[in-house]
Amino acid sequence: VIGGDECDINEHRFLVFLTXASGLACGGTLIN
């Protein structure tokens, strides 16, 4: 997991498209 944590996708709905399109876990690299 890129962000170092497992994320609840329901808490990160705005990242769903990022996760699906880029394969990022919770958009960790984008958040950081």
UniProtKB/Swiss-Prot annotation:
Tissues of expression: Expressed by the venom gland.
This protein's record includes keyword Signal: no
EC number(s) reported in the record: 3.4.21.-
Molecular-function GO term, any one: toxin activity
Domain of life: Eukaryota
Top-level class of the enzyme under EC nomenclature: hydrolase
Main subcellular location of this protein, as a coarse class: secreted
Stretches assigned to the Peptidase S1 domain: 1-32
Keywords attached to this entry: Disulfide bond, Fibrinogenolytic toxin, Glycoprotein, Hemostasis impairing toxin, Hydrolase, Protease, Secreted, Serine protease, Toxin
GO biological process, one term: proteolysis
Modifications after synthesis and translation: Contains 6 disulfide bonds. Glycosylated.
Localization: Secreted
GO cellular component: extracellular region
Oligomeric form and interacting partners: Monomer.
Additional comment: The molecular weight was determined to be 58 kDa with an isoelectric point of 4.4.
Protein function: Cleaves a kininogen analog with the release of kallidin (lysyl-bradykinin). Completely cleaves fibrinogen Aalpha chain, partially cleaves Bbeta chain and has no activity on gamma chain.
Family per record: Belongs to the peptidase S1 family. Snake venom subfamily.
Protein name, per record: Snake venom serine proteinase
